[in-house]
């Protein structure tokens, strides 16, 4: 199997849109968390994971999923404001905590300068019993491969 560079699925770029700003013309704080989730989803897709096998949808009954991955903690730090048209780089650094949880660390950069960070902790649970369970094979592989030579 060909060795892939994790940067292919862990570093993404985006441009700030008008609808993501508040009345002061600055990105609204909640957008960072939305961008984090979108970055994570895109990362999983680029890695080769089919999203509907990980996240519930109207096409799949939640009881058909092996695990659910709820957020149990999140926090953000903002160092500079962002405005419409700003281009930013989002770097994702996943870290496995134990057999049932992981944290997604995000660094937001503009022109090479770090302008914000977030971390979001997920726990793997059985979607029916809501009890902690082991992470799926797909997520474990993504976490393992994401930690190699970044």
From Swiss-Prot:
GO BP: phylloquinone biosynthetic process
Enzyme Commission (EC) number: 3.1.2.28
Active site: 22
Keywords: Hydrolase
Pathway terms, separated by semicolons: Cofactor biosynthesis; phylloquinone biosynthesis; Quinol/quinone metabolism; 1,4-dihydroxy-2-naphthoate biosynthesis; 1,4-dihydroxy-2-naphthoate from chorismate: step 7/7
Catalytic function, reaction form: 1,4-dihydroxy-2-naphthoyl-CoA + H2O = 1,4-dihydroxy-2-naphthoate + CoA + H(+)
InterPro entries, per the entry: DHNA_CoA_hydrolase (IPR022829), HotDog_dom_sf (IPR029069)
Lineage top rank: taxon: Bacteria
GO terms assigned for molecular function: 1,4-dihydroxy-2-naphthoyl-CoA thioesterase activity
Family, per entry: Belongs to the 4-hydroxybenzoyl-CoA thioesterase family. DHNA-CoA hydrolase subfamily.
Functional description taken from the UniProt entry: Catalyzes the hydrolysis of 1,4-dihydroxy-2-naphthoyl-CoA (DHNA-CoA) to 1,4-dihydroxy-2-naphthoate (DHNA), a reaction involved in phylloquinone (vitamin K1) biosynthesis.
Name of this protein: 1,4-dihydroxy-2-naphthoyl-CoA hydrolase
Native source species: Prochlorococcus marinus (strain NATL1A)
């Amino acid at each position: 199997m060909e060795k892939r560079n994790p940067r292919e699925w862990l570093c993404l770029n985006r441009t700030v849109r008008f609808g993501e700003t508040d009345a002061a013309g600055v990105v609204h704080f909640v957008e960072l968390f939305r961008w984090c989730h979108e970055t994570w989803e895109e990362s999983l897709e680029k890695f080769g994971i089919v999203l509907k096998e990980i996240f519930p949808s109207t096409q799949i009954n939640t009881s058909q999923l092996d695990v659910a991955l709820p957020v149990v903690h999140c926090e953000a730090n903002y160092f500079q404001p962002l405005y419409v048209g700003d281009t930013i780089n989002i770097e994702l650094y996943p870290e496995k905590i134990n057999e049932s949880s992981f944290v997604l660390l995000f660094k937001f950069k503009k022109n090479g300068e770090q302008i914000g960070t977030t971390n979001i902790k997920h726990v793997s649970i059985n979607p029916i019993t809501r009890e902690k369970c082991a992470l799926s094979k797909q997520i474990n592989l993504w976490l393992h491969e994401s930690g190699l030579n970044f």
